């Protein structure tokens, strides 16, 4: 996750951003994060995502440093970085490919609670990994002892529902149907 780069001073001086270029780039990243949110909200069948806006979207660089975030539910943002880092630890950067979509909801791997599902997609340009688009949203149900996974009498995390380590839902642009089936078989509301 720590990409080591050796740069001489002359190159650094040539690559300094002037304020106008910086603002243009900042605006582009902000627009991309906000657009991610708009698409997620409009495409969602879940009232928690569509109406309550219990989700967050962000763009991180190669080192998982935040570049931009959408202005919806910022409470997720601090932990989203740790989920992204857990995904990278699990697969390693060389095994994360264009077209991959990787999810995780394990509270011990950067999650907040089981119902908050994080999805990471790598961002490539001309074959080089530049960063990651990351979304975290509250799923209504992932199994467990009670609908919604919040059983008041629960004594173990297993009672909250399906706990996923980082797993590829799409690999190189191809859906892994067995993972989708696991997710769908562990919810009471298949459309949420």
Predicted regions and their residues:
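Long, charge-dense accessory insertions within large macromolecular proteins
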Residues: 2-81, 85, 185
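Conserved mixed alpha/beta core segments that line enzyme active sites in large multi-domain catalysts
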Residues: 38-39, 43, 65-67, 81-122
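Mobile "lid/hinge" segments at catalytic clefts and subdomain interfaces of large enzymes
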Residues: 126-192
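Generic secondary-structure signature for well-ordered alpha-helical cores
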Residues: 30, 34-45, 65, 89-92, ...
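Acidic, glycine-rich active-site loops and adjacent beta-strand->loop/helix elements
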Residues: 73, 106-110, 136-141
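A short, polar/charged loop-to-alpha-helix boundary motif
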Residues: 75-87, 140-149
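Core beta-strand residues in small-molecule sensory/regulatory alpha/beta domains
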Residues: 60-61, 120, 124, 136
